[in-house]
A protein has these predicted regions:
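Active-site loop-to-helix "anion-binding N-cap" substructures in soluble metabolic enzymes
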Residues: 1-250
């Protein structure tokens, strides 16, 4: 089945509004005619209005790095889906490894956020992946199955259609280590098989699974070119327009 790749930039906690606008102004002309893949930028919350305004009318979508599952309320420091949509955001990351690691985000919280995003019509990119100790203990498959199963509780096959999954081998994020294409493909197959078990073969065959773990211009082709890999969630290499352009045009 042909799946349109998504190349996504996770800017994490980098860039000022001026730097973000400069990036978009430089980047858009580089990819203006690029229709093979979808492109999305995920800046930090304070940058969302600036980036969305700068990217308006282009082929580049903009989303949040994190959202809260509540409609509104006394949740200091959080961003609601209503707020995201009010400024024009269309996507959101959910359950990024740094959210799980530093902010105690559990599979149950990921599940609540996924339900909320789908209810609002925001495209969710659900992040899953194992840490180094889990990989070395041979628990990669177990961890991925647990995270997928936990995230998808109560999700119907029909509701699941917009969902994107991003596989992040946590041991390869910001470490300079990269999963080989073979390791990445193996993980993607585990994820797709688990989705098939939960939601059916048709949904699994259509669902996009991105790779996210030290993706750079020099390894993008080898990774995204794999049949099982439907794009990339890019960190550090997405912070410069020319670097991210090379990945988009893998």
């Amino acid at each position: 089945m042909s799946r349109k790749a998504l190349i996504a930039a996770n800017w994490k906690m980098y860039k000022t509004p001026a730097e973000a606008k400069a990036f978009v102004d430089a980047f858009l002309p580089l990819v203006a005619s690029h229709t093979r893949d979808e492109i999305a930028l995920f800046p930090s919350p304070v940058l969302l209005p600036t980036v969305i305004e700068a990217a308006k009318g282009s082929n580049v979508a903009v989303g949040a790095q994190n959202i809260h599952f509540a409609e509104e309320g006394a949740y200091t420091g959080e961003t609601s889906l209503n707020q995201l949509q009010a400024v024009g955001g269309t996507h959101t990351l959910i359950g990024h490894s740094e959210r799980r690691q530093y902010f105690a985000e559990t599979d149950e919280i990921v599940n609540k956020k996924l339900h909320a995003a789908l209810k609002h019509g925001v495209i969710p990119v659900v992040c899953v992946g194992e840490v180094l100790a889990e990989r070395e203990a041979g628990k990669t498959e177990e961890v991925l199955k647990t995270q997928i199963t936990g995230a998808f509780v109560g999700i119907t096959p029909e509701a699941a259609k917009p969902i994107v999954i991003a596989y992040e081998p946590v041991w390869a994020i910001g470490t300079g280590k990269t999963a080989t294409p073979e390791i990445a493909v193996e993980a993607h197959k585990i994820i797709r098989a688990e989705v098939a078990k939960l939601l059916g073969a048709e949904v699994a065959a259509a669902m996009r699974i991105l790779y996210g773990g030290s993706v750079k211009p020099d390894n993008a082709t080898a990774l995204i070119g794999q049949e099982e890999i439907d794009g990339a969630l890019v960190g550090g290499a997405s912070l410069k327009p020319d670097s991210f352009e090379k990945i988009v045009k893998y």
